[in-house]
Swiss-Prot record:
This is Isoleucine--tRNA ligase. It comes from Bacillus cereus (strain G9842). L-isoleucyl-5'-AMP binds at E552. GO terms for molecular function: aminoacyl-tRNA deacylase activity; ATP binding; isoleucine-tRNA ligase activity; tRNA binding; zinc ion binding. GO terms for cellular component: cytosol. Belongs to the class-I aminoacyl-tRNA synthetase family. IleS type 1 subfamily. A motif ('HIGH' region) lies at residues 57-67. PANTHER family: ISOLEUCINE--TRNA LIGASE, MITOCHONDRIAL (PTHR42765:SF1), SOLEUCYL-TRNA SYNTHETASE (PTHR42765). It comes from the Bacteria. One of its GO terms (biological process) is isoleucyl-tRNA aminoacylation.
Amino acid sequence: MEYKNTLLMPKTEFPMRGNLPKREPAMQEKWAEMNIYEKVQEHTKGRPLFVLHDGPPYANGDIHMGHALNKVLKDFIVRYKSMTGFSAPYVPGWDTHGLPIEQALTNKGVKRKEMTVAEFRKLCAEYAYEQVERQREQFKRLGVRADWDNPYITLEPAYEAQQIKVFGDMAKKGYIYKGQKPVYWSPTSESALAEAEIEYQDKKSASIYVAFPVKDGKNVLEGDEKYIIWTTTPWTLPANLGISVHPELEYSIVKVNDEKYIIASELFETVAKTLEWENAEVVKTVKGSELEYTVAKHPFYDRDSLVMLGDHVTTDAGTGCVHTAPGHGEDDFVVGKKYGLEVLCPVDDKGVLTNEAPGFEGLFYDKANKPITEKLEEVGALLKLTFITHSYPHDWRTKKPIIFRATAQWFASIEAFRKELIEAVAETKWVPAWGETRLHNMVRDRGDWCISRQRAWGVPIPVFYAENGDPIITDETINHVADLFREHGSNVWFEREAKDLLPEGFTHPGSPNGEFRKETDIMDVWFDSGSSHQAVLEEREDLQRPADLYLEGSDQYRGWFNSSLSTAVAVTGKAPYKGVLSHGFVLDGEGRKMSKSIGNIVVPKKIMDQLGGDILRLWVSSVDYQSDVRISDDILKQVAEVYRKIRNTFRFLLGNLDDFKPSENAVAVAELREVDRYMLVKLNDLITKVKEAYETYDFAAVYHAIHNFCTIDLSSFYLDFAKDILYIEGANHEDRRAIQTVLYDVLVALTKLVTPILPHTADEVWPYIPGVTEESVQLTDMPEAVQLYDAEALKTKWDAFMTLRDDVLKALEVARNEKVIGKSLNASITLYPTAEMKAMLESISEDLKQLFIVSEYKLGGMMEEAPADAPKYEHTAVVVAQATGETCERCWVVSETIGKDAEHETLCERCATVVKENYVK
């Protein structure tokens, strides 16, 4: 007889190798055929809603690792919620207007100057749709389950119509106004920019100290002094109309040789050192408030520079006397307005100085720095010129520096509802908690929102102008434009004349001749995506406002979190979200930002082609995503190894359940041995821990709990000793069926627990599980932890056993290294335990050979009675010797019972019995 044929070895067709790059696309096709998204919605119908609202990625180019991190995190949450009593629809979106699409077309050779705006916009729309399609396929490849056939896209007519309504509601409440004001201006884009469209980069700039002679001292100054200002933007000096000082600061009049200078007293030493003053003496001090309305002379133009008070003046740098150009700075503008100064802005859309800057007209602003500095030197006003490298705002798209420039723009008045915004921030749950402080401070400190852009590709600002220049925004015009956009799309604005966009028979007192013109500016793209709570959450039947969660990168505090909050509070008085969760950026393995120049860009597609989507998803679950995260080949290799262990666990479980029918073979919990019940306690602990971690979005805790359970609880302990029973005993032996009962519970629970993170693998495992009826594991619920009546006692006892087992394993390892034994089945062990361990060992003595995977086990005396040379550990002393007897051909246990059965001379007594009872006819 071939005894190896009598062993019940694992048997399964579940493949050992994942081969995910090939197998996942096939699984996704299967999901598409069975309409998995709709099936899940149907399955969860009638449950309470959980809405995670997708912040729309920008439709341009392939998805990057930041996109992958974001979408996969969202997918974890939505999948988990749909398995825990919620209906969790997920509608993906795309942001499709804006400059990058215009630039992409120009780069492709589109001659936009040779076509109408409407024609150019049609090309923009076509390009945007192509990009949506490209990204949609890449997101699907990640295994993200979403309503991919019905996304929201910001260029779609229904969306644009709702955006117009949001604008109209805000205008009706008086929150929209037109004003001349300095805004971030990009000369390279020739447009205003929102705060969210700028990024800071290092820039080399001139740093100059300039003297402004006093013209009228107002009886506070004698008239022979000079104010010193410091600036890094010499090109703004032609626009200088004043000098700001702080009312509470003390200022010194400092005599240096024959000159007298005015600076903040606190900065005396710094300025003296920088300007290399020797023998400088303070002849007088005055309070900043006393200097108000004194007048200085502009250094090279024949005009006054008024001295004003401003709280924005600090002593962090400079002189405490701040050059003030109301056309080129927010603080300058506010102070200038208070003192009635004009808003002088001698720079055009392209960043070129105009004839309002005599002597420098026609120069690009950056090129004007040198001649202006030379002019200052010529007139004796330049006290010092150096160069510094400092952090300076740049256009996030063109990567070129931007300027502050006063222009006529449309604004949303944040000031009008700032109090409500701050309250809404306080009512929202923020994860991480610092998000609340971050957005609170932004909302508290931000100026009004410049919502107009001087571009072609976007949603038009729905304003008309009467003959007398009055802007027209009424309920009637807004509703009519919204209806037109819903029917024809926003291109209709560029295809028709103003009168054809107005309601029929529309009149206005400012247009006695019935003539009107339309606004040519478009809305900031942040107004587009910021209106999604109205256009998507409110409009779609399967969603609701407020959403339960917004989840985006930490750059969205100033972006989508902010713009959505502003429009929602303006329109509804409430935040559009109940909770906000943010994640960090993806860096390379060394913690560097990914960039083409370094050549360290990791692309999701490459990972999926080489390793698979589930490996990428497992990486997402492994990182502390609330901070910046790292990815590299080495990191992915480690993750792939963890995946291999999880997959092998599934394969082992399936292999040992091949002959198990739950309905026929399952053993009642009360009839299980203690060690089996202990395993169920460990499983229930895992279920509790993993579900709590999912609830708090702590996916790294899920990852570690599942990995540890597979490697420590299962592989290193339960499955290791169970092999002796699973393979060796007869198919229906009660201990074997008991272990299979536990393995079955473990398999079903583990498959469900990993589903949100490893959906492809979970759905690959699912049909192999005996007795399952559901088409997909996604149509099931998370396992419930079952509290065993003796769970605490089992845990106390068996946790203690596990620590003692560690001592035994160490002793066996030492014996192996000293060549006392080969493998552990060659060993006979005698334990000399502590008093508390002795009673525990006596209660489970019959299982101990199997639990320690040795051939012979004896209980000696107490620990103090152990032989002097026996290794002593925390809980026991252990004597390891070679087991006596011969090795059984079938189970490899060393036994003195070999050959006792004459028919089976090479088998131990146990194996001979099993063979006779199960295999001998």
